[in-house]
Amino acid sequence: MTHQTHAYHMVNPSPWPLTGALSALLMTSGLAMWFHFNSTILLMIGLTTNTLTMYQWWRDVIRESTFQGHHTPTVQKGLRYGMILFIISEVLFFTGFFWAFYHSSLAPTPELGGCWPPTGIHPLNPLEVPLLNTSVLLASGVSITWAHHSLMEGNRYPMLQALFITIALGVYFTLLQASEYYEAPFTISDGIYGSTFFVATGFHGLHVIIGSTFLIVCFFRQLKFHFTSNHHFGFEAAAWYWHFVDVVWLFLYVSIYWWGS
């Protein structure tokens, strides 16, 4: 690195992409084992290896950016493009779920009773827990923006306060969603309605958990003075991701909970 004459970061060989791929294989295989054979051993191994991989990979990235100074403006620009492309890929991912929902609901087949929701399905009231969930996520969108502006202005404690509120709202949303699933009068196996409802809202819930984890990492980094007003892409990426999760929920609420009921 002493003879480097360019602004790019030549990453050292790392085992984490390999362990990450292995943990993803174990998790997906474990999920299938859990569904079909009611065994959670493989799933737990996958979750454990995935958690360890995330911790150590994040640790290495923090070392490279904060302590070794490898994240030059050029590198940060590349990371920004990468995050934008990742969010675009997530948009297309959710587009598939919305497509399945509208394909099924706009022209219900005779097997569904020719109506939507299908005969025998009692949908959730969109003005109860789903509306509260919407309020919680919109409030978290406001608080993450407050945290971002506080960081850009160099106000450390308001930033920590706003970030903590955002994390708390994210956890609250997850608990509300879990209670809604527990009390829902239909299951994932109740035809196309149950499938589209639980897959779309379930993947969104997974993204909320991922986003909350991302924000928790940012919270602890801010406690250790890792972010400055002009060098904080880790937090910025987390904020972008959180806003994406917010917008997806608004589409889910309007489509599946409100119009679909």
Curated annotation (Swiss-Prot):
Query: Does this UniProt record's set of keywords contain Translocase?
Result: yes
According to its UniProt entry, the protein's GO biological process terms are: mitochondrial electron transport, cytochrome c to oxygen; respiratory chain complex IV assembly
Q: Name one GO molecular function term.
A: cytochrome-c oxidase activity
Keywords assigned by UniProt, alphabetized? Membrane, Mitochondrion, Mitochondrion inner membrane, Translocase, Transmembrane, Transmembrane helix
Superkingdom: Eukaryota
* Compartments where located: Mitochondrion inner membrane
Write down the InterPro entries for this protein, in alphabetical order.
Cyt_c/ubiquinol_Oxase_su3, Cyt_c_oxase_su3_dom, Cyt_c_oxidase-like_su3, Cyt_c_oxidase_su3-like_sf, Cyt_c_oxidase_su3_a-hlx
Q: Which residues lie on this side of the membrane: Mitochondrial matrix?
A: 1-15, 67-72, 153-155, 224-232
Which family does the entry's similarity section mention?
Belongs to the cytochrome c oxidase subunit 3 family.
Q: How does it assemble?
A: Component of the cytochrome c oxidase (complex IV, CIV), a multisubunit enzyme composed of 14 subunits. The complex is composed of a catalytic core of 3 subunits MT-CO1, MT-CO2 and MT-CO3, encoded in the mitochondrial DNA, and 11 supernumerary subunits COX4I, COX5A, COX5B, COX6A, COX6B, COX6C, COX7A, COX7B, COX7C, COX8 and NDUFA4, which are encoded in the nuclear genome.
Q: Which named protein is this?
A: Cytochrome c oxidase subunit 3
Q: Which organism is it from?
A: Raphicerus melanotis
What gene is this protein a product of? MT-CO3
